[in-house]
Amino acid sequence: MTFPRALTVIDDNGMVISIIFWFLLIIILILFSIALLNIIKLCMVCCNLGRTVIIVPARHAYDAYKNFMQIRAYNPDEALLV
């Protein structure tokens, strides 16, 4: 089946359509890489937020508990072997 000659504007053997598809592919790859970078940035923000909201207050609470209960740091020289 051949394409009607009356509808052919330029006989370029598909060069224009090929270039359009390559540009679309490049644009899609650029958009995908931008989305991937945004996902990585979101993971970093969540990690920092988790550390700020959960880990640092828990560490402060544990330090306060250690000071209140007078728990000393582990010293291998003072450890008793039973």
From Swiss-Prot:
Residues 1-19 are virion surface. The chain crosses the membrane at residues 20-40. Its main location: host cell. One of its GO terms (cellular component) is host cell Golgi membrane. One of its GO terms (biological process) is disruption of cellular anatomical structure in another organism. It is a single-pass type III membrane protein. It is found in: Host Golgi apparatus membrane. Belongs to the alphacoronaviruses E protein family. Homopentamer. Interacts with membrane protein M in the budding compartment of the host cell, which is located between endoplasmic reticulum and the Golgi complex. Interacts with Nucleoprotein. This is Envelope small membrane protein. It comes from Canine coronavirus (strain Insavc-1) (CCoV). The lineage of its organism: Viruses, Riboviria, Orthornavirae, Pisuviricota, Pisoniviricetes.
